[in-house]
Amino acid sequence: MLRLHWLALLVLLLPMAAAQLRPEPELDAQWDLWKRTIQKAVQRQGGRNVPEVDLGEEPEVHRCPQRGARLGKHSFQLAMNYLGDMTSEEVVRTMTGLRVPRSRPRPNGTLYVPDWSSRAPAAVDWRRKGYVTPVKDQGQCGSCWAFSSVGALEGQLKRRTGKLLSLSPQNLVYCVSNNNGCGGGYMTNAFEYVRLNRGIDSEDAYPYIGQDESCMYSPTGKAAKCRGYREIPEDNEKALKRAVARIGPVSVGIDASLPSFQFYSRGVYYDTGCNPENINHAVLAVGYGAQKGTKHWIIKNSWGTEWGNKGYVLLARNMKQTCGIANLASFPKM
């Protein structure tokens, strides 16, 4: 099974379109990175079930041709990373964790109503305004929902108090009874917990360990409160754009099940295989803009800085709901 996975990965990363010539030093660097990644995979496997990979030829990571080619050009790049020894199924099973409740009643007043009276800015990046804490790593715990929720809470805390502070995803993993800890959860359940609990601890007071244990919330470590939440109208990227522009970072859900997402490196991500109806991973929309004419969302992931572009991915915007970006979006009220 692992051997088949590696063969599929080689096919994905080897040339799939006309090759673009690169200087020898860059090829050497790519080859060295490939070998180091293979060695790291061997170490992580403990010498067991190591895939049989022929390293006799130098695999070059090329620009990824988009299925359907709707962008009209190759818009993003793939690269080997620390997830190289995992299948896409393993990544989804152990490193996502968005679980949408079967019944999602929407209490009165929780639907976000955008203000259409004025134009939204052409581009927004809340990182530059100091609303976004450093990229975190959820590890092999299905706690993406907690990191997404915490990121949105951190942005609203900055907006309300002027102070940026890392809040505790572990507080949510342990204590949100309507969710399932490392087994998965949903962002609005987390916001509602913080409201009813009258607070959430800081990361310093309640550090992340990525395991399920009993709730150890302490009011002495409380760093933020929440008075409710708002949900963005589904399948409405224009409404999501307004929310990100006027409110701050917004919790969103996407499909993160494809190998192209697993090995994303840079550029604007777009893959027609990304299914808007298969949302399995919670992330944080921290802005939007355009790169070389291609509109995108700025997405903060929780897979550490060694994934993607220092932990971030640019996701195609206004391309028929890329990966379901606007289907499960929400933010807390403070």
Swiss-Prot record:
Family stated for the protein in its record: Belongs to the peptidase C1 family.
Catalytic activity from the UniProt record: Broad proteolytic activity. With small-molecule substrates and inhibitors, the major determinant of specificity is P2, which is preferably Leu, Met > Phe, and not Arg
Listed InterPro entries: Papain-like_cys_pep_sf, Pept_asp_AS, Pept_cys_AS, Pept_his_AS, Peptidase_C1A, Peptidase_C1A_C, Peptidase_C1A_papain-like
The EC number(s) this enzyme carries: 3.4.22.38
Induction remarks: Up-regulated in response to V-Jun induced cell transformation.
Gene3D superfamilies attached to this UniProt entry: Cysteine proteinases
Residues forming the catalytic site: 144, 281, 301
Leader sequence residues: 1-19
Free-text function comment from the UniProt entry: Closely involved in osteoclastic bone resorption and may participate partially in the disorder of bone remodeling. Displays potent endoprotease activity against fibrinogen at acid pH. May play an important role in extracellular matrix degradation.
Protein encoded by which gene: CTSK
Name of the protein in question: Cathepsin K
Positions bearing carbohydrate: 108
Pfam families: Peptidase_C1
Propeptide: 20-119
Cysteines engaged in disulfide bonds, as pairs: 141-182, 175-215, 274-323
Any one annotated GO CC term: lysosome
A GO molecular-function annotation: cysteine-type endopeptidase activity
Keyword Glycoprotein tagged: yes
Key words, A-Z: Disulfide bond, Glycoprotein, Hydrolase, Protease, Signal, Thiol protease, Zymogen
Lineage: Eukaryota, Metazoa, Chordata, Craniata, Vertebrata
Any one GO biological process: proteolysis involved in protein catabolic process
Domain of life of the native organism: Eukaryota
